[in-house]
Amino acid sequence: MSGAFNNDGRGISPLIATSWERCNKLMKRETWNVPHQAQGVTFASIYRRKKAMLTLGQAALEDAWEYMAPRECALFILDETACILSRNGDPQTLQQLSALGFNDGTYCAEGIIGTCALSLAAISGQAVKTMADQHFKQVLWNWAFCATPLFDSKGRLTGTIALACPVEQTTAADLPLTLAIAREVGNLLLTDSLLAETNRHLNQLNALLESMDDGVISWDEQGNLQFINAQAARVLRLDATASQGRAITELLTLPAVLQQAIKQAHPLKHVEATFESQHQFIDAVITLKPIIETQGTSFILLLHPVEQMRQLMTSQLGKVSHTFAHMPQDDPQTRRLIHFGRQAARSSFPVLLCGEEGVGKALLSQAIHNESERAAGPYIAVNCELYGDAALAEEFIGGDRTDNENGRLSRLELAHGGTLFLEKIEYLAVELQSALLQVIKQGVITRLDARRLIPIDVKVIATTTADLAMLVEQNRFSRQLYYALHAFEITIPPLRMRRGSIPALVNNKLRSLEKRFSTRLKIDDDALARLVSCAWPGNDFELYSVIENLALSSDNGRIRVSDLPEHLFTEQATDDVSATRLSTSLSFAEVEKEAIINAAQVTGGRIQEMSALLGIGRTTLWRKMKQHGIDAGQFKRRV
């Protein structure tokens, strides 16, 4: 080929001319070697990889050939390497091309067959037509080839659509025909790709919705259920498949707050509500999201199960760490408390802890909770002084909402599955005492402004510093509630009667302060002895306060007698004077009788506790009581 002209003088495109220049360096025009052909496993692998393109492309070629027959031509589908994957067309034409080596699996690269549209379309990325002596190889001068490249959704070359015919059969419409087929196949590939991507996203979304802890429901503008995940179906006791397409109001009785929000297309966030499904009430915390569109408003509803919301809240608010292991074991009075505390932990009955201010009733309550089978559940502490007014009833026992305010779980409901610690039970409002009695006796609670019963499973531990029996007689405390709480009563002796536990309490407090202040703390023996001998009218709380102040003010972390506050010596002197007067005015028998009477008053006349408190056997105690004419029954609390 001389210059850029055919033998007849027609000009050729730069694309073809450049191809000729490359081919001149690689091959001879006169020779023709049958092109390399992929066969067997290799061809099958290529075919599988292009399955999507072939499925669409073959259908398009069949449609095109049906329109073109009986024209002498052949239609090809090639991959991005110019390997023939599929052929269709006139049998005689296919046979002639096959004789040249153009079969399924044949590689039509430029380096093999020379300048030809089959390879140039892939190289240039555009539609190309070559005919007659535009081909580099003379064996192809009797043929015309048209080819248009195919691209995927990301713009990458994925194949070629080609047409081949004898040169005398070619027409001006051949190249546009391959272009039209290629565009059709490309559009179908794009549609399939987008559909596959959409399906993939839908599968991911469905997997996400099914793996959520929350239930998810959606319904259209007509109120017909469109989607419900397994969690929502389980919570609402619905058949997910059978419920599809049905009206949401046919499946459920919606709470008033939700009905109002739907009517106003108003969103809700973490609102407590109650559904009725299959004649059962179902509590849930809901979030509603309206989707406002031109054709109407559809909705997505999230169901946050109350049980999980309780667990979430109590995991942050309802954990305590004090156990019986933290209590000193050296003192017999403390060992007695641990013994009765463990009995209380094994029991399901309410527990009443009695004793002076500051004796550690709250810590004993925590130890009972952590020893019980409810240790993994919440521990909710309530100071009843705050609930002396019935106006706070809603916070204590809850109330059903009919507006758009966020619902809030009551203190009783928060304790579900765990322990409810009621500090200073004597201050609880009379109206709330009835609600508490209902929880203890029946295991249910009735909210304010509601008729339904809510199951509540709690262990009640109450404390008091008052004489509840006297309050009952004065009609200031519920008689029935007193009976319920009095079933398991533990009296905690004041610290002055548990002096043996003071060294352990002091050391435990010092170790705790060491961790807080990151320093070493120690106390001299004489200073500790002085602390043991003090009266401690404020009990454990006063002792801890003194130790903390001493730790902050001590020199180099050492607590000496000289560091002790003066009021401790004053209290000790007062106690010494009282003891001296007692010893001079009373005989030993009178002192013994007074000690037994004091023990009976503290323990309510319970022999076993009196025996432990006095440090003598029950037989000895019975003998001495008989000797002094003391009747334990007269000290029992009567209502």
Swiss-Prot record:
GO cellular component: protein-DNA complex
Induction: Represses its own expression. DhaL and DhaK act antagonistically as coactivator and corepressor of the transcription activator by mutually exclusive binding to the sensing domain of DhaR. In the presence of dihydroxyacetone, DhaK that binds dihydroxyacetone has less affinity for DhaR and is displaced by DhaL-ADP, which stimulates DhaR activity. In the absence of dihydroxyacetone, DhaL-ADP is converted by the PTS to DhaL-ATP, which does not bind to DhaR.
Region (Sensor domain): 1-318
UniProt-recorded Gene Ontology molecular function terms: ATP binding; ATP hydrolysis activity; cis-regulatory region sequence-specific DNA binding; DNA-binding transcription activator activity
Boundaries of every Sigma-54 factor interaction domain copy: 327-552
PAS domain: residues covered: 203-265
Keywords annotated in UniProt: Activator, ATP-binding, DNA-binding, Glycerol metabolism, Nucleotide-binding, Repressor, Transcription, Transcription regulation
Keyword hit for ATP-binding: yes
Keyword Transcription assigned: yes
Residues binding ATP: 355-362, 415-424
Residues forming coiled coils: none
InterPro entries in the cross-refs: AAA+_ATPase (IPR003593), GAF (IPR003018), GAF-like_dom_sf (IPR029016), Homeodomain-like_sf (IPR009057), HTH_Fis (IPR002197), P-loop_NTPase (IPR027417), PAS (IPR000014), PAS-like_dom_sf (IPR035965)
Ranges for domain GAF: 52-189
Domain of life: Bacteria
Any GO BP annotation: regulation of DNA-templated transcription
PROSITE patterns with a match to the protein in the record: SIGMA54_INTERACT_1, SIGMA54_INTERACT_2, SIGMA54_INTERACT_4
One Pfam family this sequence matches: HTH_8
Annotated signal peptide: none
Free-text function comment from the UniProt entry: Positively regulates the dhaKLM operon from a sigma-70 promoter. Represses its own expression.
Oligomer status and interactors: Homodimer. DhaR forms complexes with DhaK and DhaL-ADP.
Full protein name: PTS-dependent dihydroxyacetone kinase operon regulatory protein
Provenance organism: Escherichia coli (strain K12)
Name of the gene encoding the protein in the UniProt record: dhaR
